[in-house]
Amino acid sequence: MTTTTSAQALTSELSNDTVLTTAMTANVRGPLLLAAAVVAGLQAGTYFTWSTGVMPGLANLDDRTFVSAMQQMNIAIVNPVFISTFLGAPVLAGAAAVFCGPHARPWAIAATVLAVGTLVISFAGNIPLNDALDAAGPVDKIKDLAAVRADFESLWVKLNLARCVSSAGALGCLVLAALRVR
């Protein structure tokens, strides 16, 4: 076999691999964007529900009931379903940015940035507030429930609204990416 023939064979093999890889990637785009959008939607819905229903409802409670309820909900929310969507939203958006193709990529990148932003808000704001609320101890042993609530509620609500907006933005960007996939 000559050098030219070997080079032609290698070029042909690489071309076939590229076609196969491109075809496989094209088959993944739709389902991947769908999964990313569904998970982003679940996250946006979670934060939306907290912003529009849970926190306004809790706002009407006395300090003792508010602190106790939030402590219990902060325990309950740390479960496999929530954690998989919480971490899955930016991971799936990032995967979509890699595999969705050039027409959809800018929107998938924007979705990834927004989904990561949601995590940053959570890790820098909401989770430390949750931890501080838990560190205050059982409601029966907290001396100043009003102060504990005041240190938590207003900022947590604002941060959750920011998470709602960023995760809804990620969902919107993923929908736009899906509309541009070719």
Spans of features found by a protein language model:
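Interfacial segments of alpha-helical transmembrane regions
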Residues: 26-41, 95-119
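Core segments of transmembrane alpha-helices
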Residues: 85-97, 164-171
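Hydrophobic alpha-helical transmembrane segments of integral membrane proteins
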Residues: 112-133
